Design a protein with these regions (language model features):
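Beta-strand-dominated extracellular/periplasmic modules and repeats
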Residues: 1-194
């Protein structure tokens, strides 16, 4: 008896459209995290999700969580004695397009205290859901050239030659940042086991 192997295929289909408001109509307002009165340095962050071969990952979903410009999360676990910026929404969720892209309008986050109360470098927490993943993957986006990166306690846990995979790079225009997120392969982004 000859057995035919099962075809290699990713899990799916991935129903991101049910979780990303406005996806079907092209409304990307779920990626606008900074309102008109939001304090801090406004940034436009373009995230591009790529597979092993450097091809765009379509039908993925990206979630961002971050502190406001003063380094305060709008979350009960943040016990700092400060009020979060009421005009800032520290969460955004978008689907990737046919180029693997999604664009968030936010602010550069402030430094937040770490486990030993040492200030962490400005960063954005990222969750990725995509075809072929059985569960989300989680990373951080840091900002290239920020002097707070070097002493950051989480960054120091990552081998030096892998840290670049977590860096957003400045764009041509002021306030624009780009981040390439590689799910697998030789340029794979560092992911955390959370």
């Amino acid at each position: 008896m000859d057995l035919i192997p099962t075809a290699n295929q990713p899990i799916g289909p991935f129903y991101h459209f049910a979780l990303t408001p406005g996806w079907a109509t092209g409304d990307n307002s779920a990626g606008v995290m900074a309102g008109p009165g939001t304090l801090g340095e406004r940034i436009r962050l373009t995230v591009r999700v790529l597979d092993r071969d450097g091809s765009p990952v379509t039908n993925g979903m990206i979630e961002l969580w971050q502190a406001d410009a003063a380094g305060k999360y709008d979350h009960p676990a943040d016990t700092q004695n400060r009020t979060p910026d009421p005009a800032f929404r520290g969460f955004g969720r978008l689907a990737t397009d046919d180029q693997g892209l999604c664009v968030f309008e936010t602010v550069k986050p402030g430094q937040v205290p770490g486990l030993r109360r040492q200030l962490q470098a400005p960063h954005i927490n990222v969750s990725v859901y995509a075809p072929g993943l059985l569960r989300r993957v989680v990373t951080r986006i840091y900002f290239e050239g920020d002097p707070a990166n070097e002493p950051d306690e989480i960054m120091r846990l990552v081998p030096e030659d892998r840290r670049a995979s977590m860096m957003a790079r400045p764009g041509v225009e002021s306030g624009q940042w780009g981040f390439e997120l590689h799910l697998t392969g030789p340029c794979e982004t560092v992911f955390f086991d959370v």
